[in-house]
């Protein structure tokens, strides 16, 4: 197996196959569930809006892949600093049956100098998730933070407040995941000594098998080749799947989605 094939198979099994569009429908989510079951293995999860969780759960069970996890988003995509709303949305997502919640960190508040609200928001959402055995990923929106010190600070605050994963981006802003921001975030995980319990998720802009290979190489360099498993690493993407399948000899690499 070539290096690209090997990394593509790894990446496919680490995907949170995503649809977060305003025009999402039950039919589109059902199609996403079908796509998550591939000839070479399943994606780790799907990521959808909360209202579609019941139909996704039913579809995944019917197609014989109940182990594919269901992730959803809260405080999304704006990352406002209203803790009560973020918490209410997170509790609602859990009630819908989410296995994982990707909450947006109040990044604009941090840019304005308020570190406390981010900590408090993540901590509140973590308490709700932990009580239900739900994984919490925190989206820090690196493309808006821009500055390395802010990316580092948002990562540190999220981890201290209990994040199970730190995630680069919503996919809804001009700049999403980059290898540079990925390295900074994973270095924070390393420097804080939390690599056993905190994972990393690049999202938005990871579109090709070659892109995925680059991101995995950074993880391997920092943590060794065994670290990036589904408990410690995810790719938030949709169009990436077609590219990975093509690299693995399935399909033409074309995708209907741009995330």
Swiss-Prot record:
Its main location: cytoplasm. SMART domains: DeoC. It catalyses: 2-deoxy-D-ribose 5-phosphate = D-glyceraldehyde 3-phosphate + acetaldehyde. It comes from the Bacteria. The keyword Cytoplasm applies. Pathway: Carbohydrate degradation; 2-deoxy-D-ribose 1-phosphate degradation; D-glyceraldehyde 3-phosphate and acetaldehyde from 2-deoxy-alpha-D-ribose 1-phosphate: step 2/2. The active site is at residues 102, 167, 201. Pfam families: DeoC (PF01791). Transmembrane segments: none annotated. Keywords: Cytoplasm, Lyase, Schiff base. GO terms for cellular component: cytoplasm. Its EC number is 4.1.2.4. GO terms for molecular function: deoxyribose-phosphate aldolase activity. NCBIfam families: deoC. Catalyzes a reversible aldol reaction between acetaldehyde and D-glyceraldehyde 3-phosphate to generate 2-deoxy-D-ribose 5-phosphate. This is Deoxyribose-phosphate aldolase. It comes from Escherichia coli O1:K1 / APEC. The lineage of its organism: Bacteria, Pseudomonadati, Pseudomonadota, Gammaproteobacteria, Enterobacterales.
